């Protein structure tokens, strides 16, 4: 178990001067709203679409000050030109295309592959994704031995540099897959991080079977845990799609406080919150982002998550399975006892 850190963090004067007067990221994100709506443009979207442009600049500068991080992130913004769409599409079944796309992705930098149909709530308000009804989601695992050095400092940039390297993989892999799809005769558009765009990656990744939402607001995969970055590719290629997978991460988070206790600004809630019509895990933007911006992107919560440590996920899955089986047996015994008492 982690030791609960004393919450002594307070933003510095430069950050406080950059924070827009009266603005709340929680309000923009829809915290407390029980009606369903699309997500609004927010952090890492273009600065003219939300009030936190100056805060984004501080976050970028903080990260660039750490050794090697600037070069690592620069590769993430190297967007290659895509091939034109082949006017004569090849003929395959949806299952065949899905298998071929998966094989291509997993041999071109990606560690995980999933596909789902594009849903309206994946698309950020004010944006459009037209005539591309499917979404391919890709996952990229961190080198945990590097990631665990977050947050970065002026002396140690290993953690932020590792984040930058994985975002660079996101770019390479998503652009390579989109290019391959276009050469097969179908339209495709890549959506890598870290810049935000039209597509919300985590909801699409959950529906594509890549994992569950964790208490820390990041995806938890059954193999790599929270030790992941994501990229997406929208396309009109016909694909068989995957189902959501619930393997126990959500139940685990209900009874775990490690990321919650480790968060310096106390931004991670013990309970789920209502956000745009859904009760789910939510990280307090107004508490998180000051520390995130001043400390090279932070990432403490995913580094301390028990699911992130290599080799741990399998043991956690086995533990969760035993717990569910024990609870099922208890319910059967209770039902039999009630029946016998009648």
Tell what function each PLM region has:
Residues 102, 111-326:
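Catalytic cores of enzyme domains
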């Amino acid at each position: 178990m982690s030791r609960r850190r004393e919450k002594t963090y307070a933003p510095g004067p430069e950050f406080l001067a950059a924070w827009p007067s009266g603005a709340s990221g929680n309000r923009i994100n829809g915290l407390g709203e029980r009606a369903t709506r699309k997500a609004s443009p927010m952090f890492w979207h273009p600065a003219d679409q939300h009030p936190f442009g100056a805060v984004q600049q501080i976050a970028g500068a903080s990260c660039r000050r750490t050794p090697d991080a600037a070069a690592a992130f620069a590769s993430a913004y190297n967007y290659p030109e895509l091939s034109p769409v082949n006017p004569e599409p090849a003929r395959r079944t949806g299952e065949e295309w899905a298998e071929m796309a998966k094989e291509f992705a997993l041999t071109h930098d990606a560690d995980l592959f999933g596909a789902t149909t594009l849903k309206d709530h994946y698309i950020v308000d004010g944006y459009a994704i037209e005539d591309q009804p499917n979404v391919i989601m890709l996952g990229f695992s961190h080198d945990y031995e590097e990631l665990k050095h977050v947050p970065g400092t002026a002396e140690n940039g290993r953690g932020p540099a590792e984040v930058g390297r994985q975002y660079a993989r996101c770019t390479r892999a998503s652009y390579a897959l989109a290019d391959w799809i276009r050469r097969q005769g179908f339209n495709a558009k890549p959506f890598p991080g870290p810049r935000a765009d039209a597509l919300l990656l985590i909801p699409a990744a959950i529906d594509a079977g890549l994992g569950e939402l964790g208490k820390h607001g990041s995806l938890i995969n059954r193999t790599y845990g929270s030790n992941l970055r994501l990229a997406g590719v929208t396309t009109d290629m016909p694909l068989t799609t995957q189902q959501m997978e619930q393997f126990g991460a959500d139940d685990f988070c209900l009874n775990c406080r490690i990321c919650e206790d480790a968060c310096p600004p106390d931004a991670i809630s013990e309970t789920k919150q209502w956000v745009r019509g859904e009760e789910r895990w939510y990280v307090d933007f107004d508490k998180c982002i000051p520390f995130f911006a001043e400390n090279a992107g932070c990432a403490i919560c995913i580094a301390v998550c028990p699911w992130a440590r290599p080799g741990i996920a399998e043991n956690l899955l086995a533990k969760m399975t035993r717990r569910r089986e024990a609870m099922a047996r208890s319910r059967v015994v209770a039902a039999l006892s009630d029946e016998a008492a009648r």
